[in-house]
Amino acid sequence: MPPQLVVFDLDETITRHDTLLPYAMGFVIRRKPWRLPLFATVAPPTVEYLLGRSDEGRVKESFIKAALAGTRRSDIDAWTSRFVPPLIARGTFANAMERIAEHRRAGDHLVLMSASTDLYVPTIARELGFNETICTGVRWDGDRLNGSLTTPNRKGEEKARCFTALREQHPGLDTTAYGNSSTDLPHLRLATHGFLVNGSEKARRAARELGVACVDWT
């Protein structure tokens, strides 16, 4: 079988839970608990988002700034090195790991595409043997983390845009894509073979209408 272009979402598709919250909060609690009161600054952009006046990217940006702004690159790298191994060992779906291994054996081009950030997603991708990573970028000021986003939040229609660009970069390849939520459907529907993993009932109904297969992973 010829190689395929295979795109995996990360949070709740490969991993059992969200990754950004435990990554950032784990760092703060262990390394800089004095920053906890700064999370109050996340409330205003969250309210704006809930009222439809802002996008989720601004909430993410404010959260990252509250938790990590000003942190040295060496400290971020050290925390990432500590955070990723147990996440892969104990925080992933066995079925996801098996499917990744199958695609690697088949010689497929594996892309990890996530709304989570480039502080740690590329490390996860390397550890799992992915060929390429697309994720939300975060700005640095020299050796210190700024926390502003340098890319659009890689979610929803933005993922569909990135998926379309990937297909253009790899012409002639069949495509397989895995995601877990209704916000993944815009790019799953574009794939030759799209799979909704452990989706909600509402997401499953929408997936079936779009011809996206539904699977359950443990």
What are these regions (language model features)?
Residues 46-49, 57-73, 132-137:
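Short, compositionally biased "basic patch" segments
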Residues 1-3, 78, 85-218:
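C-terminal cap/substrate-recognition subdomain and adjoining C-terminal extension
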Residues 18, 71, 158:
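Conserved active-site and cofactor/substrate-binding residues in soluble primary-metabolism enzymes
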Residues 4, 31-33, 37, 50-56, ...:
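Conserved alpha/beta cores of soluble small-molecule-handling proteins
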Residues 20, 59-61, 142-148:
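Acidic/polar active-site rim loop that often engages polyanionic ligands
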Residues 59-94:
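Metal-dependent phosphoesterase signature
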Residues 1-51:
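Active-site neighborhood of HAD-like aspartate-dependent phosphohydrolases
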